[in-house]
C-alpha cells in the first residue's frame, strides 16, 4: 500500500514543477548536466589561459558569472522538484532517479567552485583597474577580498567549495598571483608614502642635518596612510629613523630647529633639525654635554609631532598611526625624557623650586602626547610617576647640590683662618653669658660652611602636608656628618703633623656645635646627637695633638742626666730650656687660635706633665751636694721665670697643680735641715700639700750628710 502511494505521489510532484513524467525529469537532468559540463570546460579553458599558460585573454569573467548564475538557478529548481520526501519516493521506486538527484548536487558543487574561481578572476581584473586610478583604499579592499576567497576566510564560500578549490592545479598559481599583487600594492603604497612623507638625513664630520617634509595634500595622504597601515605595514624603519635622528637628539643635545609651513611652493610642511655629533672628550659621556633646557625640548617635541600630524589618522576605534609609532619608540623616549631631560631640570634650591613650573609643564605635555595618541596615559605612566616623585627628585637634587658644595668646602685648606667673636673675652663667656661663643680663630672654610647652612635654614619653605616630606629635613645633619667624616680623611697628614691644624679643626667643630645649639628650634634633626658627635670629634683630634706634644716633652726629658754625683753639668739645663722652647713654639701657634680657657687649660696640663717629669728626675738623685743643690735651684728658677710667660695672664700658671710643688722644691734646695722640718711641721706644714713624708725623708737624705741631726729630723717627718 505504501509503495503504491509513493508511486501515485510522484507524477503529482513532477507535474507541479513542469515535468510531465519521470522520463521528462531524467531528460531535463541530462540536458542540464551536459550544459554544465560544457560551461565548466569553457571556464577551465579560461582559467588555464589566465593562470597556467598566461595567454592574452580578453574574455570578461562577468559573462561566465551570469551563465553560472543561470545554471545555478535551473539546478536549484530541479533539486526543489526532488525534495526530501520526493527523494525518499524515488529511492523506493527508482534508484536511477535518486542517482540523478545526487549528480545534480555534484553539478551544483562543481558550478559553485567554478563561480568561486570566476569571482577571484574578476577581483584580479578589478585590482588592475583600481591601480590605474591610484585608488589605494579600493585596491586594498579588493586585495583583502581576494585573500578571503583564496584562503577561505570568513563566509566567502562553503568549506566544500574551498576544499575542492584548494586541491585544483590552478590554486598555487592563483595564490602566487595574489602574493605578487599584494607585494606590488605594498611597494606602490610605500613609494607613494615616501613621496608624501620625505625623511632625509645628511651626515657631516661633526654634525648632522635632518629634514622632514610632509605633504599638505590631505586627501592623498589620508588614503595612502590608511591603506599602508592597514596592509600589515611594518613601521620599524620609520620609527627607527624618528627615534635615532629626531627624538634622541632633541632630548640629549642642543638642536637647531626650523619649521617652514610653506615649503616646496606651499605643498609641504618642512621641519629641519641640525645638531652636533661630536662626542664628549670625557668618559662620562652625555653627563658632560651641554643639555638643552627642558622647555625647549618639550616645545621642539610639539613641533615634531605637529609636523607629522598629517599622517596621524585613525585606523580603528582604538588605534591611530601615532599609537603604532608609539609602541615602537615610547619606552626609549620616556626613559630619555625623564632621566636625561626632566630629572636634570629639577630645581636645586628652594627659590628655584617655588618659581618652577616643571610639574605643570610636564602634565600639559603628557596630555598633549595622550591627545596625539602617542602614549596611553593609563599604561605609559612615566611622566605621571615623575610628577608624583617630583618632591623626592627635588630633595635628592638639593641634597646632591649641598653635598657637592660641602665637599668642595671640605677640600679647602684649614690653615686659612679668620677671627670670630672678637669681643667675647673669656670672662664674658664664663661669667656673664655661657651661651656666648668665645673669641678664637676658625678656618675660613668653616665660616663658609656655616654660611651655607644658614642659607639652607633661610630657604623660604612651605609647611609640607601630612603625606609630603619636608625637602630640607635632615640636610643640615647630612652636611655636618659629612664634615665630621671627611675632614679627618682629607687632611689626615696635616692634622697629625701640624699642631695648628688640629686646633683649628677642634675650633671648627666647637663653632658648629655652638651654631647647632643656637638653631635647635629651627627643626635641625638629631640635634642632641649632632652636638655630642661634633664635640667628641673635635675634642678627640685635639687630644691626640696634646698627647703628641706631651710625648715630645717626655722624649726630651728622657735624656735628663746629671754630669756626676756632685755636679749638675750643662746637659739638664739645656734639656729644660729645650722643653720651654717647645712650649714657646706651641704658644705661638696656639695662643691666638684657641679660646683663652682652652689654651690655658691645655698649657696647664702640658706644664704639669713637664714639671712632674723634672721633679721625678731630681728625686732620682740619691746624693745632692751643696753645689748641685744650688745648680738645681737655678735650673728651677729658669722654669719659674719662663713658665708664667706662656700665659696672657701670668697668674694662670698657678693653675698648674705641680707649680707650688716646684716652688717648694726650689725652697728646699736652699733650705737648712731645720727649715725643712719646720715647713713640714709634723705633717701640718705647707709641704704636706704637695709632698708625702717618704719624699721629704728621701730628699733630706740626699741633701744632708748622715748625722744625728739628720736622723733626728727624719724622725720628725711622719
UniProtKB/Swiss-Prot annotation:
InterPro entries in the cross-refs: Zw10/DSL1_C_sf, ZW10_C, ZW10_C_2, Zw10_middle, Zw10_N
Alphabetic keyword roster: Cell cycle, Cell division, Centromere, Chromosome, Cytoplasm, Kinetochore, Meiosis, Mitosis, Nucleus
Family: Belongs to the ZW10 family.
Keyword Nucleotide-binding: no
Gene source species: Drosophila pseudoobscura pseudoobscura (Fruit fly)
Function: Required for accurate chromosome segregation.
GO cellular component term, pick one: nucleus
Segment forming the signal sequence: none
Name listed for the protein in its UniProt record: Centromere/kinetochore protein zw10
PANTHER family tied to this protein: CENTROMERE/KINETOCHORE PROTEIN ZW10, CENTROMERE_KINETOCHORE PROTEIN ZW10 HOMOLOG
BP GO annotations: cell division; endoplasmic reticulum to Golgi vesicle-mediated transport; meiotic cell cycle; mitotic spindle assembly checkpoint signaling
Any matching Pfam family: ZW10_C
Subcellular location: Cytoplasm; Nucleus; Chromosome, Centromere, Kinetochore
